[in-house]
């Protein structure tokens, strides 16, 4: 399944301990996303000097780029507590109300996958975000009554991979909107070298670059690949990650020079071989490779679009000339 892919940006269970050990705790340690860092730094400093809660922050972009890490950094920089939850975990309005009423002044509440909040939960967020009040309905039917509770000023940090799915009323209540972009190879090299130092892994500069080139512009993938290449180096190469060792390990793991794995190649080959390169509808393509449409949109497509191997058109998905070239297929070869 896509959730277990080595190069997928979503969080694996085995990633949690690794990410905690590698996660930067302040903006100065955070590598990449320079524009986001600069703007957040200004807003955080201003809120801190005024003794106010920071405006609500929406972080959006593909998975694995550091949204959760930034939420923790915001809380650390403000000197307040971080409360963490997710959209799917908040099934009832009471679940969110319990969290909100236990916040301390200026605390940061982080809601991951905020686009998956149930509507009834989302609606109690509106007055909480705008006026720092919580409206609770007691009872049912004609005898129901509403009471209003004051909340301490707080900062909501919402994270999503699909900002377009947020309702307008919710999106409009975020004062700070920051899109996280894919990382450059040089930035990923720096992240890998930092992680190698923390993990006490011997790595040469060219080894770090080889991993960075195949990490799909995503720090989470870079750290995961480093962990796997470290295992290979310890067993097959005396523990030192050189360029050749990294290349051998990643080829063994079926991660090619562009960062595509067997699942990416299967999607592109299916599009080319079965559907003549497209266009083909999302549902049809998903069925052809036995994946969920949401998985294709959230996990596969961001990187394939970024690399120019795939196009979304009004008529469906289309494989680009770049995809043919990468797979070593001539456009005329697609015809049967």
Curated annotation (Swiss-Prot):
Gene3D superfamilies xref list: 1.10.8.60, P-loop containing nucleotide triphosphate hydrolases, Winged helix-like DNA-binding domain superfamily/Winged helix DNA-binding domain
Pfam families (UniProt xref): AAA_lid_4 (PF17864), RuvB_C (PF05491), RuvB_N (PF05496)
Region (Large ATPase domain (RuvB-L)): 1-183
Broad EC category: hydrolase
Catalysed reaction equations from the record: ATP + H2O = ADP + phosphate + H(+)
InterPro entries in alphabetical order: AAA+_ATPase, AAA_lid_4, DNA_helicase_Holl-junc_RuvB, P-loop_NTPase, RuvB-like_N, RuvB_C, WH-like_DNA-bd_sf, WH_DNA-bd_sf
Matching CDD domains: AAA
Span list, region Head domain (RuvB-H): 257-336
Residues involved in ATP binding: 22-23, 64, 67-69, 130-132, 173, 183, 220
Residues that, per the record, bind Mg(2+): 68
Keyword line: ATP-binding, Cytoplasm, DNA damage, DNA recombination, DNA repair, DNA-binding, Hydrolase, Nucleotide-binding
Any one GO biological process: DNA repair
Residues annotated to bind DNA: 312, 317
Region (Small ATPAse domain (RuvB-S)) residue spans: 184-254
GO cellular component, one term: cytoplasm
GO molecular function annotation: ATP binding; ATP hydrolysis activity; four-way junction DNA binding; four-way junction helicase activity
Subcellular localization, as worded in the UniProt entry: Cytoplasm
Entry's EC annotation: 3.6.4.-
The family this protein is said to belong to: Belongs to the RuvB family.
Subunit structure of this chain's protein: Homohexamer. Forms an RuvA(8)-RuvB(12)-Holliday junction (HJ) complex. HJ DNA is sandwiched between 2 RuvA tetramers; dsDNA enters through RuvA and exits via RuvB. An RuvB hexamer assembles on each DNA strand where it exits the tetramer. Each RuvB hexamer is contacted by two RuvA subunits (via domain III) on 2 adjacent RuvB subunits; this complex drives branch migration. In the full resolvosome a probable DNA-RuvA(4)-RuvB(12)-RuvC(2) complex forms which resolves the HJ.
Function: The RuvA-RuvB-RuvC complex processes Holliday junction (HJ) DNA during genetic recombination and DNA repair, while the RuvA-RuvB complex plays an important role in the rescue of blocked DNA replication forks via replication fork reversal (RFR). RuvA specifically binds to HJ cruciform DNA, conferring on it an open structure. The RuvB hexamer acts as an ATP-dependent pump, pulling dsDNA into and through the RuvAB complex. RuvB forms 2 homohexamers on either side of HJ DNA bound by 1 or 2 RuvA tetramers; 4 subunits per hexamer contact DNA at a time.
Domain notes: Has 3 domains, the large (RuvB-L) and small ATPase (RuvB-S) domains and the C-terminal head (RuvB-H) domain. The head domain binds DNA, while the ATPase domains jointly bind ATP, ADP or are empty depending on the state of the subunit in the translocation cycle. During a single DNA translocation step the structure of each domain remains the same, but their relative positions change.
Protein name: Holliday junction branch migration complex subunit RuvB
Organism, scientific name: Moorella thermoacetica (strain ATCC 39073 / JCM 9320)
């Amino acid at each position: 399944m896509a959730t277990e892919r080595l190069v997928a940006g979503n969080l694996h269970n085995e990633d949690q301990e690794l990410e905690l050990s590698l996660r930067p705790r302040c903006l100065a340690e955070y590598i990449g996303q320079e524009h986001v860092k600069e703007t957040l730094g200004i807003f955080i400093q201003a809120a801190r000097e005024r003794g106010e809660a920071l405006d609500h922050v929406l972080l959006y972009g593909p998975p694995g780029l550091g949204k959760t890490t930034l939420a923790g950094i915001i809380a650390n920089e403000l000197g307040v507590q971080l409360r963490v939850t997710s959209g799917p975990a908040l099934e009832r309005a009471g679940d969110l109300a319990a969290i909100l009423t236990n916040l301390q002044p200026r605390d940061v509440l982080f809601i991951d996958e905020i686009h998956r909040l149930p509507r009834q939960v989302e609606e109690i967020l509106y007055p909480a975000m705008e006026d720092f009040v919580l409206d609770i309905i007691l009872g049912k039917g004609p005898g129901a009554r509403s009471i209003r509770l004051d909340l301490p000023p707080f900062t909501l940090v919402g994270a999503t991979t699909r900002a377009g799915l947020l309702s307008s009323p919710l999106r409009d209540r975020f004062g700070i909107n920051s899109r996280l972009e894919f990382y450059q190879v040089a930035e990923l090299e720096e992240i890998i070298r930092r992680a190698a130092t923390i993990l006490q892994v011997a790595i040469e500069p060219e080894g770090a670059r080889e991993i960075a080139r195949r990490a799909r512009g995503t720090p989470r993938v870079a750290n995961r690949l480093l962990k796997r290449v470290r295992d290979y180096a310890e067993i097959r190469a005396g523990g030192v990650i050189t360029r050749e060792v990294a290349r051998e390990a990643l080829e063994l793991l079926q991660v090619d020079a562009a960062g595509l794995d067997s699942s990416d190649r299967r999607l592109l080959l299916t599009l080319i071989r079965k559907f003549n390169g497209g266009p083909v509808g999302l549902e049809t393509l998903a069925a052809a490779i036995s994946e969920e449409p949401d998985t294709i949109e959230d996990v596969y497509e961001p990187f394939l679009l970024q690399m120019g191997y795939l196009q979304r058109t009004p008529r469906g998905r289309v494989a680009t000339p770049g995809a043919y070239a990468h797979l070593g297929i001539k456009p005329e070869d697609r015809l049967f």
